[in-house]
Each structure stands twice: as C-alpha cells, then as structure tokens.
C-alpha cells in the first residue's frame, strides 16, 4: 500500500496523537526511567495547533505521511540560521543554515516500511531548498530501532553526546 507525504491538514491532530502514543509506548517500555506516555486527553488538539502553526512560519516545517486515508507518521523540523556572533562560531556548523529535525514519528505497526525515510527525504529537500547545508536531529541512544535507522539506513553520523545529571 502506498504512502503519501503531504503538508498537514486540519483534522490531522487525532492521527498524529495516535502515532505519538504508538511510538511513545515503545520508548516507555524501553526505558521507563526517562520516558512516559503523555495523557491522551487534549493531545490531539495540541498536535493540531502545533502542526498548523509550524506551517504558517517560514522557518518551520511539518509533514504528514498518509496511508489508506490514515496518518501513518509525521515529522516536524525548523531552520536555524547562522549565528552572527563570532563567539558562537567555534563550532563550524553554527555559521551555517541548519535544518533541525524536531521529531520523526511513525506508527509502530508500520515501522520498516519506508515511511520514516520518506519523511526525512522530504524534509531534507525542504531544508536544502531554503539554504540549509546540514541537517541535525537527536534520538535516544539506547534505541535498537532508531540508532540503526539513522546510522545505517539514512546516512546520518553521530556528532555529539548529550550529558544529563539530575539535580534532586
């Protein structure tokens, strides 16, 4: 069955919430210390408002993957422009326009069917058309699904490590 990658439409919030909860359950099971399922109440409205607002901002982007009339996945991203301050340009990429992928979510039942790849490919094209010279994203390093997806299937390379320490 084919997948259509398209801009979001009013009414997509419910499907986006369903996909978020589906993929989120995987992460909550994988590492319950760091992940939890959000309350379902109000989630669809929240996604609806966010995705529509993103596409009214020239530097933000949202996409929906539709399969058989249902939301099968979605992606949000935004552009980060070069920093004009020299103090921020020690890291070379901060002097470039960057595409930051905020989220790539695919219904867990549809993983490994090319939906995530199609969403990323469309986002990369959008960023390239707007002058981005690099795309960045983050993922949970303990995921046996997302790490191979990004590193082996889509050509992304690890570039940094994020540290965290609880303060309580």
Regions found by a protein language model. Give the residues of each.
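A short helix-loop-beta-strand connector motif used in the catalytic cores of GNAT acetyltransferases and
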Residues: 49-63, 82, 100
